[in-house]
């Protein structure tokens, strides 16, 4: 399964110490550089920045080859996550922001938010 993630789901799961749900559910997760930069921003909680610094083996940073052309006002992380999901023909895009979800769905990407992925988690995760 190919999964691409935006910043918010990763940030929330790390803060509540449930980031291990991701490899349990999906194996490997791809993020674009803009998402990595947002996760490492000075305003990001220290726990998230430390998690990224010791990046787990299941998290891969991959740059999209093309930029996303859209009329919707999305931040760079959202645009790169959608572009990467399109390029790798992702099975799933983890993204929470409403406008980004609408744009991704318009592009026929399957989207799941942080809370939507929780019920799919195995009991041991």
What are these model-predicted stretches?
Residues 1-92, 98, 102-110:
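Active-site-proximal, substrate-binding regions of enzyme catalytic domains
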Residues 112-125:
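Short alpha-helix plus adjacent loop in nuclease-associated cores
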């Amino acid at each position: 399964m190919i999964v691409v993630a935006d910043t918010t789901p990763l940030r929330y799961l790390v803060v509540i110490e449930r980031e291990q749900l991701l490899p349990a559910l999906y194996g490997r997760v791809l993020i674009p550089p803009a998402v990595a930069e947002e996760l490492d921003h000075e305003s990001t909680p220290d726990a998230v920045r430390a998690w990224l610094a010791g990046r787990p083996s299941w998290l891969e940073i991959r740059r999209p080859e093309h930029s996303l052309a859209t009329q919707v006002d999305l931040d760079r992380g959202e645009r790169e996550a959608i572009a990467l999901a399109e390029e790798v023909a992702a099975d799933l895009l983890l993204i929470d922001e409403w406008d980004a979800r609408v744009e991704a769905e318009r592009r026929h990407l399957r989207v799941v938010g942080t809370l939507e992925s929780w019920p799919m988690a195995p009991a041991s995760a």
